[in-house]
């Protein structure tokens, strides 16, 4: 498995002829400004406009004229027709948003006659793809190297350096640490560009046109451009070469217009709640007093120009939420056009749904359950569901967990489907390639903890979930689904095998239509997994609750043990231990962010003597890892959820020892 790489082969394609001579410098070994080739120095080209955002100027392309931004490859490949085997491409771009499943081309080299894509750089919401044509005796194949890059689609400027050397592909973003990929298929040594054409921001047609801003697009033959750019005081706007028209101020004053200094320019600033941002408000400012931020209307979107950075200052109690009984799990979710809700999984015969009203949760609906352990909210198309994991059998002695469906007419959840489970602890809902799944964590059947947990698949024909795959588990407590690039993973928290809590929890990867074992972790009464991402780094945290073996005498300190954070190591193709954190019978991790800071809060439930133990908030400190910053008094803490409203950010936790859940407000400064 290569977490950040997918190599895709398509059916053999007819390829243009290529030279048979050895490689020689077909271009000058200097930075070749691709943008300057298509934009005159005065900027007078139809089909593009110059836009300034965050103090920097970029080009915005028009759907009407993709061919305008193109030129023949022979213009820069003057000596021969071979693309260099070693090179780097530098791009400075701004992408405000990108709809799901949309792909936009930053650069392509296309054979004029056959319309073959010889080389391309393509952006999707979560990945940057480098495409090239590879030939052998069987024909020609298009190959794709994909880098995970969700941080690019944030409305800010970023400078990327893609360096290629045979089978090694490297991507550096904003002078950060490079992401290297060792590909099975190297870049070809003899890629002919005879009769080809460079296209900026498109693949020769309107479909896939790059709709963001591009400021820099440079090809550097023969070497990696990173040392020329980095380090930089302003890494997102590091410059190797940009067109003159983007360096100087654009536009000329009218004959009767007097040039003003910037501080004398008349601008319109709107105060109050967020106003509309349309063509009418284009280039106007809005000051948000509540967030202390200044925003500029650009292309139907308010772009932050100046904003105070939020930092977590302290945590204060906001609401004591009385529940029907002790609460074993909580689920916060939103229903469009209806509001924000929290579902509580209560120990006794009734669980509840609460609605956020006037800055607090109020009772909305009671639902009969049987020692409910967890709720899971999910959607399929326009359908909204809520699944409960029941731990005990019903009045007839039958064990069922129930899926409820939201009624848009009644504005309530109504029973939809019952599924036979065995002391269910958790549901996990996920989607893979457009198909919907539910995984149940079956904890035990009678006294037997070594039983199968089940993955169910939605059948669009019957509109029901049907058993799709069984996985052997040992006292399963939690499932967690996540994706890395094109790969889908499912990790289970195994708690007890009948004799010991020292059992392995397993990570599964989906291959050929089913989940297969990928990696095993030594765990101690594992109760929860939490996956999260910081920048390009992917982490997996396990909550260890108890170190116990039937052959050993119970000790109080067996609850005070390390929980572990693992980090994905792409080279090793595995998660490796990143940090140990001492916890007290930890039952849950919750990851959240405030401004530019990242946090983890742990649900500490028992220290061997008392259930009144502090749960801890940890802040990400870079190379130091997570460091404790806040201590929160809790009683039998079982579950944490983070959520936000227009009024601010909050945490809510459930107690397994008292009929009270608490809502905490995160105060920022």
Curated annotation (Swiss-Prot):
So which domain of life are we looking at?
A: Eukaryota
Q: Which residues form the signal peptide?
A: 1-19
S-S bridge residues: none
Q: What is the effect of changing residue 626 to S?
A: In STHAG10; uncertain significance
Q: Which GO terms describe its biological process?
A: hair cycle process; Notch signaling pathway; regulation of Notch signaling pathway; sensory perception of sound; signal transduction; tooth mineralization
Q: Which UniProt keywords apply?
A: Cell projection, Deafness, Disease variant, Ectodermal dysplasia, Glycoprotein, Hearing, Non-syndromic deafness, Repeat, Secreted, Signal
GO cellular component term of the entry, any? extracellular region
Q: Where is the Laminin G-like domain?
A: 58-277
Residue ranges of EAR repeats: 313-358, 360-408, 412-460, 464-506, 514-570, 574-622, 625-668
The coiled-coil segments of this chain are none
Primary location group: secreted
Record annotation: effect of changing residue 444 to W: In STHAG10; uncertain significance
Question: Outcome of mutating residue 585 to I, per the record?
Answer: In ECTD14; uncertain significance
According to the record, the segments passing through the membrane are none
Instruction: From the Swiss-Prot or TrEMBL record, state where the protein is found.
Output: Secreted; Cell surface; Cell projection, Stereocilium
| Glycosylation sites per record | 320, 468, 497, 556, 569
Which Pfam families does the UniProt record give? EPTP (PF03736)
Do you know which Gene3D superfamilies this protein is assigned to? 2.60.120.200
What InterPro entries would the database entry show? ConA-like_dom_sf, EAR, EPTP, TSPN-like_N
Q: What does this protein do?
A: Plays a critical role in tooth and hair follicle morphogenesis through regulation of the Notch signaling pathway. May play a role in development or function of the auditory system.
What illness does the record link it to?
Deafness, autosomal recessive, 98: A form of non-syndromic sensorineural hearing loss with prelingual onset. Sensorineural deafness results from damage to the neural receptors of the inner ear, the nerve pathways to the brain, or the area of the brain that receives sound information.
Name of the protein described by the UniProt record: Thrombospondin-type laminin G domain and EAR repeat-containing protein
- This chain's source organism reads Homo sapiens
Query: Mind giving the lineage of the organism this protein is from?
Result: Eukaryota, Metazoa, Chordata, Craniata, Vertebrata
Gene responsible for this protein: TSPEAR
């Amino acid at each position: 498995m290569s977490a950040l790489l997918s190599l895709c082969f398509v059916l053999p394609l007819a390829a243009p002829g290529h030279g048979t001579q050895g490689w020689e410098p077909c271009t000058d070994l200097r930075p070749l400004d691709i943008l300057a080739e298509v934009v005159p120095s005065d900027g007078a080209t139809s089909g593009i406009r110059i836009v300034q955002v965050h103090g920097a100027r970029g080009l915005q392309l028009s759907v009407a004229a993709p061919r305008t931004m193109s030129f023949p490859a022979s213009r820069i490949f003057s000596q021969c027709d071979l693309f260099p085997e070693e090179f780097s491409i530098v791009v400075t771009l701004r992408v405000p948003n990108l709809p799901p499943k949309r792909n936009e081309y930053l650069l392509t080299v296309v054979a004029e006659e056959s319309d073959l894509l010889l080389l391309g750089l393509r952006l999707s919401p979560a990945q940057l793809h480098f495409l090239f044509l590879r030939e052998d005796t069987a024909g020609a194949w298009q190959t794709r190297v994909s880098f995970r890059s969700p941080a690019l689609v944030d409305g800010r400027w970023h400078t990327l350096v893609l360096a290629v050397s045979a089978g090694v592909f490297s991507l550096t973003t904003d002078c950060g640490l490079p992401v290297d990929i060792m590909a099975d298929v190297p870049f070809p040594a003899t890629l002919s560009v005879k009769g080809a054409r460079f296209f900026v921001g498109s693949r020769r047609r309107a479909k896939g046109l790059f709709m963001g801003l591009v400021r820099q697009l440079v090809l550097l033959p023969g070497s990696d451009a990173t040392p020329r750019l980095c380090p930089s005081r302003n890494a997102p706007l590091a410059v190797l070469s940009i067109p003159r028209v983007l360096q100087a101020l654009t536009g000329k004053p009218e004959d009767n217009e007097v040039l003003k200094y910037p501080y004398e320019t008349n601008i319109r600033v709107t105060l109050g709640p967020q106003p509309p941002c349309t063509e009418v408000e284009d280039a106007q400012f809005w000051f948000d007093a509540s967030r202390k931020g200044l925003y500029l209307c650009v292309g139907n979107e308010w772009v932050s120009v100046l904003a105070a950075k939020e930092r977590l200052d302290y945590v204060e109690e906001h609401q004591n939420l009385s529940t029907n009984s002790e609460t074993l799990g909580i689920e916060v979710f939103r229903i469009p056009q209806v509001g924000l809700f929290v579902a509580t999984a209560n120990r006794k015969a009734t669980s509840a749904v609460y609605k956020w009203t006037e800055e607090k949760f109020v009772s909305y609906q009671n639902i009969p359950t049987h020692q409910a352990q967890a709720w899971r909210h999910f959607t399929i198309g326009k359908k909204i569901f809520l699944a409960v994991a029941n731990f005990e059998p019903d009045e007839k002695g039958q064990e069922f967990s129930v899926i409820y469906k939201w009624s848009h007419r009644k504005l309530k959840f109504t029973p939809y489907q019952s599924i036979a489970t065995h002391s269910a602890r958790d549901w996990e809902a996920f989607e893979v390639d457009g198909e919907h799944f539910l995984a149940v964590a079956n904890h035990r059947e009678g006294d037997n903890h070594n039983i199968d947990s089940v993955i169910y698949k939605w059948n669009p024909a019957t509109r029901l979930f049907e058993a799709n795959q069984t996985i052997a588990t040992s006292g399963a407590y939690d499932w967690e689904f996540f994706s890395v690039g094109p790969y889908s993973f499912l990790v289970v928290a195994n708690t007890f095998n009948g004799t010991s809590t020292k059992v392995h929890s397993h990570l599964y990867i989906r291959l050929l239509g089913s989940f297969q074992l990928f990696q095993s972790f030594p765990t101690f009464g594992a109760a929860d997994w939490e996956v999260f991402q910081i920048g390009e780094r992917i982490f997996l945290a396990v909550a260890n609750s108890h170190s116990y073996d039937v052959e050993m005498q119970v000790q109080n300190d067996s609850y005070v043990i390390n929980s572990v954070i693992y980090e994905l190591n792409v080279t090793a193709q595995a998660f490796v231990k990143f940090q140990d954190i001492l916890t007290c019978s930890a039952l849950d991790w919750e990851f959240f962010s405030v401004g530019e800071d990242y946090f983890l809060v742990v649900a500490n439930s028992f220290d061997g003597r008392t259930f009144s133990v502090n749960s801890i908030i940890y802040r990400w400190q870079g190379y130091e890892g997570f460091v404790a910053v806040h201590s929160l008094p809790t009683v039998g803490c079982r579950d944490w959820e983070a959520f936000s409203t227009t009024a601010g950010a909050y945490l809510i936790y459930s107690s397994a020892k008292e009929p009270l859940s608490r809502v905490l407000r995160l105060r920022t400064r």
